[in-house]
């Protein structure tokens, strides 16, 4: 007793420490052990006294006292009676807090089924009984009897009997001949009598005997479930409940409102229902009521328990008085408002405030302006403590008064308290980690927070009314972390791409750009200045201008740190910037030798950061910001309407395009082109015209004239703003002074008539109407985009949250090949950029000399990356998170550089979350649009290739035919044109499409810009490889082709139609055969005949009986036919790739290398076989819908991994056929393409990290001697561990293939059930976990946040390591002491005392 009193004022003891959490089914005994008493009455509180009713839902005897240390009747009050149970009212005298943790229970008069295990699919109860869910429900809800024990009767076990059948059976066989039951009792009896081990053995036997795939799957699922029950220690009958727990009353409170009414939690209503029905059932059973009444009551009890656990899962939703569905226990956990996401993963915190932000250009980068009023409120406890320490107040109450009166000494104290105490600023939405940064507060008057202009980019903040929140880190550790990790000065680089994110924008850029302009013939040209002061004097007295070319003295340091001076040619403006550069050997004045656009400034800051370090960069950024603002203000740049110059060439360009368009119209009328082709060509012509007008306008605006005095005129202000990157873009200027161009309909199609006017001229009514159409869609899209982007980020974070750097080096030699990204001869991303900051997996050799540039396992920094690029290396093998062999997490060597720091990554860095944020954050900038034919108004179809460099032409896999004009026509689908230089090195290679007309021959010399080949971008031709007579096969008018007469032109053309609809036409296959003069089909070199199958939509270019020459086109397939598949762009495309969905018309990929053969058709599918060259492999067959355009002909040799059918490939196919590296490359290229289009740079590493998380499962192929089942999906780590165990025991190991899961699926299948439950489908995840008796080892971030521990990343990772080390040391010391005791034979009392001493030490620590 005395001991307790001593401890009363001490803080509560720390909670139990644990390192795993297990979830399982609760047995009735377990529920009783939790409970403090049975709830027998549905009453809550007495309406007059407001005291809880005895034995009711709020009973104080069961759940504990309402007031601290006071029993209900008031006999015992005060702490001295602690622990006594009042003999009058039965309440234990203790803290009222126990009402939050004590549970009760309800004894059910009849068992009921737990709805989660009954209705959560797949139904566990139905599966273990091997019955249909419908049948189980029939039994449970008292519609049918079930035979439990058939005895000697011909009835089957588990057979259902209706009421009549049951009566008849009883009459026929006698009442005791068999047992049948109804309701949950019957099901429970079956489950109790079930012998799981025997049942498992039986299912195993069945699996061996069955031949059907379906049955195998069914057996496997059932076997898995029964094994789960056996291994987890759960009993199947626990899925039927005989007693239900009642949660503590404080968690379902009853709150009095004014006016004598009460607000109550829905759970109380649901519990009341259960108790009422249960009591009524008890009474009916005692009264021996008729069976039918009891049965009805039992069914109602089952329904009320169902509603309590999961309202609305079965039957009608139970609603409250206001027709609103009641929130059941499941709803408490589910969704955004549920326990997981509302209270465990995100909490509201104390010591925080929010206010509007304003710009603070006079702040240093690490400061923010904090309003005094806010600071006073936020730092209250610190102020109280300091006032006390200084002796200005004696008690907390006095301090409070001082602060409330805002006495002068309080402000002095506040200044002291705030000094060097960082605060965190956050702007919602926090899309990446730079959305929260720490600053040192600077007290300001006013009520708005001041923010440094350079951090706006990271916060994505602007000052049009944005608000930000302030948080105060309280503990010393928190302050330390805020200062070292989160300070704005420590976050100069963006974690997404490693480029500086503290980059000037807008006014600053404009000021710096203006400073760096250089002009001819300015006053004072050629003067030389010795010092900064001379220069300023000359500027002040207008002897020179900012743009005059002058000579000046520059002082710097060389490599050894010695001072050097030299004379440089520069302008006064540029000299100011040069003077700001940090003193360093690499910082040369030539760095500021051209116009400073936003990009150039970014690159400059990057250089400063790389060479001079963080501190110098921060100072440099602050200085150029000040300079930029000052000079922009002094320059006084502004613009008026007249600065927008409309180019004179516009009229001619528009006129020329109008002529072209009328040409196309005429061709269409004459029947030379189809409607679709005309549309494509018109859109194309206008798109080109718009671009030409825009270029003419830019030329016009960027021109500067020379005046009579030889001075260059001022640069056009609008051009300056756009060119410097301060504001506006070429696209916006095009709309202001060029022509607005083509507009899109909301569906994404492009309207043929463009908007020829610009905003300066004004739009006509029709043009305005056309433009509103797409503009409105744009606004609607933006709203949807934000939500979609947020959801993508959430899924990404969830799948990657447990990916943490856990060790230095996993020691793998694996890696995957990295090359430069080349698009149409242009290098989009160089090899240098792609390998920077990675670790090489293999040595890199100089392709020319063959000497080793660097060995394997070298970390690639800027210098090495450049050296590799300069040596002309084509590709390197680098390590990647994808190939890392660390069990849990990733190793630092495979990951490489931490992009936000520019150094090797630290252990404990949460790279998964960083990857998710880097990919999700730019999501709002991506478009939502799904482009229809024609793409955007920007994209013109490419219809030719030009040589990008000089060299010699060679062909790979050539297959050509020379047409009547003497041009080569490409006939192979995998033919490549390669240009090699004099040393025989590949300079560029182009894949040639089927039917490309080549302008060069093998061995020709090329010059840069020469046309190499061309094709019609709007149709795919079918080319005859031989000359002869055309014979039509299966081309029947009205069945497989129809003559389409164009209404506009009256010209008829024959088009292949979908013939598969009619029954008799099913076997048709429209084909064009080329015959010789004897009427025999001509044989090709490959051995097949010259016959060409036609796809739906093909337009015939020849008639039956025509003569054709080699290279002639016999039919053409309009490519919108092949391209109507929408080009899913932007966000939906990224989501589609990460979710690993199969695209609608996905490509068919060849699984082996071999020759293509067409087999017998099957229904309306065409059978295609690939026959391998050797004998060892089997041939592979595919069924492809007829009428689809195939990319290969019969007899073609096709390589493994090539497409038989065009389209987007399904990622699963790539993984299965070509393996992980090919899949990774495909996903990286596709995802990066979307981001590159929007100009968002993201490092490949992030995408690789997410893909790694998508490949965490393995599908078992051969289980070996493991307990796995064939085709079962197993966790990769688990699989490796099982195999290691099998190998150690000398057993046969399991084999399997990696499986690709979409991010949602992967999140739901993580090893941690807590993480999965907090993501989506909470009930399903928890049901599954409970049946399996899963353990959560708390490895990821989410589960640790939920249970309230330090996350195992960053400082938390280190703390965890120390903990493990400390535990081991303790164990060793104890062992040593015991050994010593045994050796010396000390008396046991001393040993016990020593042990107690140890325990006390442990407790104290």
From Swiss-Prot:
What is written in the cofactor note of this entry? Binds 1 Mg(2+) ion per subunit. Binds 2 Zn(2+) ions per subunit.
GO MF, one term, reads: DNA binding
Fetch the SMART domains from UniProt.
RPOLA_N
**GO BP annotation list:** DNA-templated transcription
The catalytic activity of this protein is classed by the Enzyme Commission as: 2.7.7.6
CDD domains with a match to the protein in the record: RNAP_beta'_C, RNAP_beta'_N
The UniProt record gives the binding positions of Zn(2+) 1 as: 71, 73, 86, 89
A Pfam family in this protein? RNA_pol_Rpb1_2
Listed cofactors: Mg(2+); Zn(2+)
The UniProt annotation places Mg(2+) binding at 462, 464, 466
Record PANTHER family:
DNA-DIRECTED RNA POLYMERASE, DNA-DIRECTED RNA POLYMERASE SUBUNIT BETA
Q: Which family does it belong to?
A: Belongs to the RNA polymerase beta' chain family.
The record describes its quaternary structure and partners as:
The RNAP catalytic core consists of 2 alpha, 1 beta, 1 beta' and 1 omega subunit. When a sigma factor is associated with the core the holoenzyme is formed, which can initiate transcription.
Per the entry, what this protein does is:
DNA-dependent RNA polymerase catalyzes the transcription of DNA into RNA using the four ribonucleoside triphosphates as substrates.
Could you tell me which NCBIfam families the record lists for this protein?
rpoC_TIGR (TIGR02386)
Protein name as catalogued: DNA-directed RNA polymerase subunit beta'
Source organism:
Maricaulis maris (strain MCS10)
The gene that this protein is the product of is rpoC
């Amino acid at each position: 007793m005395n001991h307790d009193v001593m401890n009363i004022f001490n803080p509560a003891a720390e909670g139990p420490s644990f390192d795993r959490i297990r979830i399982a089914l609760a047995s009735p005994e377990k529920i009783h052990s939790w409970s403090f008493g049975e709830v027998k009455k549905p009453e809550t509180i007495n309406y007059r006294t407001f005291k809880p009713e005895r034995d009711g839902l709020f009973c104080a005897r069961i759940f504990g006292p309402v007031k601290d240390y006071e029993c209900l009747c008031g006999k015992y009050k005060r702490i001295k009676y602690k622990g006594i149970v009042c003999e009058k009212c039965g309440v234990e005298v203790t803290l009222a807090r126990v009402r939050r943790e004590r549970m009760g229970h309800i004894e059910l008069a009849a068992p009921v089924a737990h709805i989660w295990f009954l209705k959560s699919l797949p139904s566990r109860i139905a599966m273990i009984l091997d019955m249909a869910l419908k049948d189980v429900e029939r039994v449970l809800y008292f519609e049918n009897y079930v035979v439990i024990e058939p005895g000697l009767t011909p009835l089957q076990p588990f057979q259902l009997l209706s009421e009549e059948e049951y009566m008849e059976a009883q009459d026929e066989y006698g009442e005791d001949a068999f047992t049948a039951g109804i309701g949950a009792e019957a099901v429970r009896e079956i489950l109790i009598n079930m012998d799981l081990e025997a049942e498992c053995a039986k299912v195993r036997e069945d699996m061996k005997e069955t031949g059907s795939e379906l049955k195998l799957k069914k057996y496997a699922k059932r076997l898995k479930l029964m094994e789960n029950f056996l291994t987890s220690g759960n009993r199947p009958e626990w899925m039927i409940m005989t007693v239900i727990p009642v949660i503590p009353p404080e968690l379902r409170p009853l709150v009095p409102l004014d006016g004598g009414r009460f607000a109550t939690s829905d759970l109380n209503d649901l519990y009341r229902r259960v108790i009422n029905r249960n009591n009524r059932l008890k009474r009916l059973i005692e009264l021996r009521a008729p069976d039918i009444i009891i049965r009805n009551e039992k069914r109602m009890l089952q329904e009320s328990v169902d509603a309590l656990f999961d309202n609305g899962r079965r039957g009608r939703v139970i609603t409250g008085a206001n027709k609103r569905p009641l929130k059941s226990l499941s709803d408490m956990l589910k969704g955004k408002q549920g326990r997981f996401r509302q209270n465990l993963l995100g909490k509201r915190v104390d010591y925080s405030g929010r206010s509007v932000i304003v710009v603070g250009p006079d702040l240093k980068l690490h400061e923010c302006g904090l309003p005094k009023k806010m600071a006073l409120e936020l730092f209250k406890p610190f102020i109280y403590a300091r006032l006390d320490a200084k002796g200005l107040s004696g008690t907390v109450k006095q301090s409070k008064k001082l602060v409330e009166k805002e006495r002068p000494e309080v402000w002095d104290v506040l200044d002291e308290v705030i000094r060097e105490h960082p605060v965190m600023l956050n702007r919602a939405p926090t899309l990446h980690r730079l959305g929260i940064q720490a600053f040192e507060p600077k007290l300001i008057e006013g009520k708005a927070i001041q923010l440094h202009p350079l951090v706006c980019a990271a916060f994505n903040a602007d000052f049009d009314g944005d608000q930000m929140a302030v948080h105060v880190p309280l503990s010393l550790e928190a302050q330390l972390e805020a200062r070292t990790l989160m300070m704005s000065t420590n976050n100069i680089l963006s974690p997404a791409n490693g480029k500086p994110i503290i980059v000037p924008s807008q006014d600053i850029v404009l000021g710096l750009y203006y400073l760096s302009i250089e002009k001819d013939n300015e006053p004072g040209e050629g003067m030389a200045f010795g010092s900064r002061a001379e220069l300023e004097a000359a500027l002040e007295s207008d002897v020179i201008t900012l743009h005059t070319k002058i000579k000046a003295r520059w002082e710097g340091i060389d490599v050894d740190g010695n001072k050097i001076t030299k004379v440089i040619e520069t302008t006064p403006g540029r000299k100011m910037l040069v003077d700001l550069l940090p003193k360093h050997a690499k910082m040369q004045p030539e760095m500021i030798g051209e116009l400073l656009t936003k990009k150039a400034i970014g690159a400059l800051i990057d250089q400063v950061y790389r060479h001079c370090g963080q501190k110098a960069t921060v100072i440099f950024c602050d200085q150029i910001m000040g300079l930029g603002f000052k000079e922009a203000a002094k320059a006084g740049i502004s613009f008026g309407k007249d600065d927008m110059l409309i180019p004179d060439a516009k009229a001619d360009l528009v006129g020329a395009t109008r002529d072209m368009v009328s040409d196309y119209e005429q061709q269409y009328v004459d029947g030379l082109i189809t409607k679709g082709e005309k549309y494509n060509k018109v859109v194309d012509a206008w798109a080109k015209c718009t671009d030409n007008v825009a270029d003419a306008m830019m030329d016009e605006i960027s021109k500067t004239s020379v005046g009579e005095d030889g001075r260059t005129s001022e640069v056009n202000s609008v051009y300056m703003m756009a060119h410097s990157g301060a504001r506006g873009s070429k696209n916006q200027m095009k709309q202001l002074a060029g022509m607005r161009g083509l507009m899109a309909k909301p569906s994404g199609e492009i309207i043929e008539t463009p908007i020829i006017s610009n905003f300066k001229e004004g739009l006509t009514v029709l043009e305005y109407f056309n433009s509103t159409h797409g503009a409105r869609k744009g606004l609607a899209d933006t709203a949807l985009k934000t939500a979609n982007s947020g959801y993508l980020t959430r899924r990404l974070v969830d799948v990657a949250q447990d990916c943490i750097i856990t060790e230095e080096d996993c020691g793998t030699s694996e890696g995957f090949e990295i090359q430069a990204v080349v698009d149409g001869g242009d290098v989009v991303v160089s090899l240098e950029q792609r390998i920077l900051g990675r670790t090489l997996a293999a040595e890199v050799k100089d392709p020319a000399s063959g000497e080793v540039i660097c060995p394997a396992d070298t970390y690639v920094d800027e210098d090495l990356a450049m050296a590799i690029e300069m040596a002309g290396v084509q590709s390197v093998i680098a390590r990647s998170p994808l190939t890392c062999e660390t069990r849990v997490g990733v190793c630092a060597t495979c990951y490489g550089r931490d992009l936000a720091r520019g150094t090797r990554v630290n252990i404990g860095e949460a790279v998964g979350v960083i990857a998710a944020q880097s990919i999700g954050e730019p999501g709002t900038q991506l478009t939502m649009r799904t482009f229809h034919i024609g793409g955007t108004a920007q994209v013109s179809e490419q219809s030719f290739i030009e040589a990008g460099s000089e060299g010699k032409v060679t062909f790979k896999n050539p297959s050509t035919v020379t047409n009547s004009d003497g041009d080569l026509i490409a006939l192979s689908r995998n033919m490549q044109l390669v240009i090699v230089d004099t040393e025989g090195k590949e300079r560029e290679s182009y894949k040639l499409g089927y039917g490309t007309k080549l302008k060069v021959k093998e061995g020709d010399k090329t010059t840069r810009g020469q046309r190499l080949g061309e094709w019609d971008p709007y149709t795919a031709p079918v080319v005859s490889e031989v000359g002869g007579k055309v014979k039509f096969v299966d081309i029947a008018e009205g069945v497989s082709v129809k003559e389409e007469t164009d209404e506009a032109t009256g010209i008829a053309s024959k088009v292949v139609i979908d013939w598969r609809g009619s029954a008799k036409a099913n076997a048709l296959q429209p084909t064009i055969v080329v015959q010789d003069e004897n009427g025999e089909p001509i044989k090709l070199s490959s051995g097949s005949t010259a016959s060409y199958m036609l796809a739906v939509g093909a337009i015939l270019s020849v008639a039956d009986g025509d003569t054709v020459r080699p290279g002639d086109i016999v039919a053409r397939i309009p490519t919108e036919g092949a391209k109507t598949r929408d080009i899913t762009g932007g966000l939906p495309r990224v989501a589609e790739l990460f979710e690993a969905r199969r695209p609608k018309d996905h490509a068919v990929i060849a699984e082996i290398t071999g020759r293509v053969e067409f087999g017998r058709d099957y229904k309306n599918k065409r059978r295609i076989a690939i026959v391998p060259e050797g004998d060892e492999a089997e041939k592979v067959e595919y069924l492809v819908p007829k009428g689809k355009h195939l990319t290969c002909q019969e007899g073609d040799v096709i390589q493994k991994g090539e497409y038989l059918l065009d389209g987007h490939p399904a990622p699963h196919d790539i993984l299965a056929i070509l393996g992980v590296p090919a899949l990774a490359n495909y996903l990286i290229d596709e995802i990066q393409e979307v981001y590159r289009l929007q100009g968002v740079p993201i490092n490949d590493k992030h995408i690789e990290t997410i893909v790694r998380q998508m490949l965490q499962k393995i599908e078992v192929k051969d289980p070996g001697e493991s307990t796995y089942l064939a085709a079962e999906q197993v966790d990769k780590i688990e699989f490796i561990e099982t195999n290691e165990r099998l190998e150690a025991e000398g057993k046969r190991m399991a084999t399997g293939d990696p499986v690709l899961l979409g991010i949602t699926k992967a999140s739901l299948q993580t090893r941690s059930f807590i993480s999965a439950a907090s993501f989506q489908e909470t009930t399903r995840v928890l049901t599954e976990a409970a049946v399996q008796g899963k353990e959560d080892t708390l490895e990821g971030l989410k589960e640790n946040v939920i249970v309230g521990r330090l996350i195992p990343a960053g400082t938390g990772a280190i703390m965890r390591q120390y903990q493990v080390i400390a535990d081991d040391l303790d164990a060793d010391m104890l062992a040593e002491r015991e050994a010593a005791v045994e050796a010396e034979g000390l008396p046991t009392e001393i040993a016990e005392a020593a042990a107690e001493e140890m325990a006390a030490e442990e407790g104290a620590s």
